[in-house]
Amino acid sequence: MRFSPQLEQGRLLVRYKRFLADIETDSGELLTIHCPNTGSMLNCMMPGGRVWFSRSNDPKRKLPGTWEISETPQGRLACINTGRANTLVEEALRAGVISELTGFTALKREVAYGQEKSRVDFRLEYPDGYLYLEVKSVTLGFDGSSVAAFPDAVTQRGARHLRELATLAREGVRAVLLYCVNLTGIDAVRPAQEIDPAYAAALREAIDAGVQILAYGAQLTSEEIFIDRRLQVHGLD
């Protein structure tokens, strides 16, 4: 996926109220833009750090742009716009990049399912039945490590999705959780036990129930982003 329009660059001043960020563009313009990420963004919001944003020409929008990419203190690029992950995964699915999930005959997004009234990111149809696929965007990395972690903040919603997938798996329905790692320089991903032990426990229970766990990494520049490789998943035993 190519970023269109082309991203503009600036420096982060501050992120606040979770969904807002003040930046200074390279031309010296001061802007308040939308932050499309509900997490803590622990390694992605250093004041003075480089950021890239998309600018909107829609006069009905309250904010002129959307924060898309951060440069982390480790010099990595992270796509912090969590809404991009599902688009990337759909592109990869249709291109056959995710080898474990090829052969489907139909794809639907945001399908209602489950006892807790969730909406799954993708429902893939195969000749022998449905596959339910939940996607999580990963951007949390650490100094000196090529292993990313999820989540970067406590996520009750993430644990609920795992419970829903586990219920399907126990009923004999194929259920998959895919970590879409939108952070450069990463070889593997793990559950962030130290941040959300309840999520890590729910992940282990989902695996025991038969949920399949996958991780794929994205190639990322300020011009384009696309999924290009499978990653290892650590900490599942």
Swiss-Prot record:
A GO MF label: DNA binding
Stored Pfam families: SfsA (PF03749), SfsA_N (PF17746)
Entries under InterPro entries matching the protein: SfsA (IPR005224), SfsA_C (IPR040452), SfsA_N (IPR041465)
Record family assignment: Belongs to the SfsA family.
Protein name, per record: Sugar fermentation stimulation protein homolog
Organism per entry: Pseudomonas syringae pv. syringae (strain B728a)
